Every structure is written in structure tokens, then in C-alpha cells.
Amino acid sequence: MRQTEITPIEMKVLMNHIYELQKGVRQMVLFTCPKQYEAYATKRLCSQNMDFVLQPAGKNNLNFYIGCKECLNAIRLIVTRPLNELTPEEDFILGTMLGYDLCAQCERYCERKTACKGRCDKCQHAQ
């Protein structure tokens, strides 16, 4: 009897992201997974010739930014600390790069920017 390998849901999500990137549905994705899947995810991305940037996401997770080199070069400059510490401007740029709804990103930016008026911890790095 042949034994089938069970693929964790996180890896199914990764495979879907790879498919969408290869088909041109998306230009860049952010994939978050538990650290235990780092080797599998890295091997899969490399086998598909996908460029990516890997960053820690808390104690137990990793963020894989996957996409074209130009976008990933920008990610390396913009995302230099945990996502919850990004300035409203950095958060807006990242969301837009990831293809999130532009109007929703504008609304989120305005809410974040006016809520703290540059005086809270989240805006400490704002220029």
C-alpha cells in the first residue's frame, strides 16, 4: 500500500502563492509561516527559481517576501524592523506593494497618521 504525504495547510498556501506569482496574478506576496517550515519553504522557493527575502516575525514565525528582485530590494530598505513598528508611510508603501486595496490602504494610512499625530511609538521613526 502506498503511503501519501500530508502537506500542511501553510505549505498549500505557499504553493498557491507560487502559482499566482508564476501566472502573473500577483507581483509580490508576503507569506508568514511557523519557523518549523523554513527548510521546506526555502527549498520549494529555490526549486521554483523564486526570489525572496526572509525575515523573522516574532518568536515563532517567519515572513517570506516573494517576488521580483526590484520589489525585494525595496523591501530590504523599507522593512527594517517588525511590521507593527513600521511608520504609517512604510506601512502604506508595503501594503500597496503587496497589492492590497488602494482605497483601504489610503484609509488605513489616514487613520494611523491622524490617530497619533506623530507622537506615539508607532510614529517615532516618521520623518
Predicted regions and their residues:
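Domain-length accessory/inserted modules outside core catalytic folds
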Residues: 1-127
